[in-house]
Amino acid sequence: MAIRRWLLERQKSTQAATSDDDTLSPLRSAAAAVTATATATTAVPPTLQDSAQAPSSPPPKRQRVIVGQQWQQPDSTRKVREGQVECQNDRSIRNPDSTDPRRGHSDLDAVPVIHLQGEANCLKCFRYRVQKHKDVLFVKASSTWHWACGNGDKTAFVTLWYKSQEQRAEFLTRVHLPKGVKALPGYMSAFV
């Protein structure tokens, strides 16, 4: 806005000077033409011409779910519909036809495992001793691990994977566990 006023004042002063000095009038008219084209090309947009008008506010944010409130505006950035779980694979999560009573409704691709629980160094030594029989006794062995949160118990775990329940049962009958080590049988999803 200030630039526009300055240009108008300059044009008025140029016109007044033209009447005083007719010899420079061709140059001044050319300068006025250049100034007029510059004003036309650098015109201020109509939305910003009125200095009293404030710039528009950003779009409103998506509403959050409030306790007791049952609806939320849909998240347009996600492609998963409400009630669905986003997953990298399309495998079935549960097997309702499972016949194993211990497994209940377990994953279709769950493998039998044993979590060996005990003192960390004892578990490492045990894993090293049974490693030479790996092909017969188990498929995989994990490193020693601990729970990150909880009651602060320093108990360590080593997880052994098996091809079948029969291989796991054979392991439990053939191998003598060291004193202080407990075997916790279970199933884990095969994420290999």
Curated annotation (Swiss-Prot):
Pfam families: PPV_E2_C. GO terms for cellular component: host cell nucleus. Keywords: Host nucleus. GO terms for molecular function: DNA binding; DNA-binding transcription factor activity. Residues 76-106 have a biased composition (Basic and acidic residues). Belongs to the papillomaviridae E8^E2C protein family. Plays a role in limiting the replication of viral DNA in keratinocytes. Recruits the host NCoR/SMRT complex to viral replication foci to mediate repression of both viral replication and transcription. This is Protein E8^E2C.
